[in-house]
Amino acid sequence: MAAQAVIFALMIPRLASVVMAQTVTKKEFAKYLARDLHCYHCGISDDTLVPQHRQNRGMGGSRMRSKPSNVVVVCSHSNGMFESSDRASKAAQRYGWKLRAGQDPLSSPVFDAYEGVWYLFDDDFNRIQVKAPG
């Protein structure tokens, strides 16, 4: 279902909000947009923005994984690349846009490529600027 939703969002970007509704509420997504402002990968800030679960939700989803620390805003094009390309997925892991199983979103920084800044997210829809990892 999730793969179909991503493909749908890529084919019809203006209807990406339909896909978004399957993962987070409109009210929650508005909070993500207020926090993130644009796609953390390319910087675009249009109607193609979607929530990217940093740690996969798995089949059937998980409420725990829908916490604000586990969601970053990206455009539907970037989301599709992260989910379909091994190379893009590995890059997304390096920058915190995707997390491996077992990684804690609260302690895993995420890179805003548009701003050139690393952030930590909390579960109250806040972001805190941090130094680059490593």
Predicted regions and their residues:
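Arg/Lys-rich, low-complexity, intrinsically disordered N-terminal tails that contact nucleic acids
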Residues: 2-28, 130-134
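Short, charged low-complexity linear segments at domain edges
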Residues: 11-24, 43-60
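Short cysteine-rich loop/turn motifs with clustered Cys
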Residues: 23-50, 75-78
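Short, surface-exposed beta-edge/turn micro-motifs
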Residues: 36, 69-72, 107
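Short Cys/His-centered divalent metal-binding micro-motifs
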Residues: 47, 68-94
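Short cysteine/histidine-rich metal-coordination sites, predominantly Zn2+-binding motifs
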Residues: 54-60, 90-100
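Short linker/helix segments within small regulatory modules
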Residues: 56-70
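Short flanking/linker segments adjacent to small metal-binding domains or redox-active Cys/His motifs
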Residues: 99-134
